[in-house]
Amino acid sequence: LLGTKLLMAGHNVTLVCRKNTAELINRGGTEVRIKLRDEATHRAIFSRDLPGSLDAAAPADVEISRYDLVGLAMQEPQYTNHAIEVLMIRIAEARLPCLSIMNMPPLPYLRRIAALAEADLDEAYTNAAVWERFEPGLVTLCSPDPQAFRPPEEAANVLHVGLPTNFKAATFADAKHNALLRELEADIDAVRLDGLDVPVKLKVFDSLFVPLAKWSMLLTGNYRCITPHEPQSIRDAVHGDIRQSQAIYDHVDAIARKLGADAADQWPFAK
């Protein structure tokens, strides 16, 4: 989804995926289905119709020197795959800025928070060694992420956007990298489709704590979808006991404030 927004803004994107998926994307491109404001049905946006160029590659085939920015878009345990781990070493050595849309904040990002800089956090990660070469100031995080999924009946190059919210990114440590981030923000904001605004923007914030608004949402909703018996929807997880849900949400918000967040960085439970 983020790649498609960048393509719509005229930037070039490489998706790193399994070999078979890379071959599929290089052959047929991608399709992202998204609903525009006040429209009843989703529109299909095909990469082949966009001004930016898209290709895909397996981890071993990525040529690092081609890129200005890396997007980290997998679940945290997946970074322990050997081919991915080798690619991550190359990214860290190249000192490329990394924009994460992971649910689990990358360890170098948490090191940017003064209260966590010296904390022993390794056990929270499947393999913390994946992150040890990264300079903290080169890693930033987005929140809250739009909700999107691959329809199970479709090929792996199709994505359906269910909740078209914005990517809210904290800044990097380097002004040069922030200039790139704000350029992408402006370019994405300017995109129109048949004269209409396209949802899912990239918004840049100075506070490191804006992305941590995700914690309260995930722990109140998504992470309570798995029960001892059967899965439940996010709606049921939250509304099944609204008082308990608000208590969880407020508790996690309080932890973020204890780490240094301002209430203005957070997202009210009622919304």
Please place each PLM-identified region on the residue numbering:
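NAD(P)+-binding Rossmann beta1-loop-alpha1 motif at the extreme N-terminus of oxidoreductases
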Residues: L1-I34, L107
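Rossmann-like NAD(P)-binding element
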Residues: R43-S100
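Short, flexible active-site loops
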Residues: N166, I226-G240
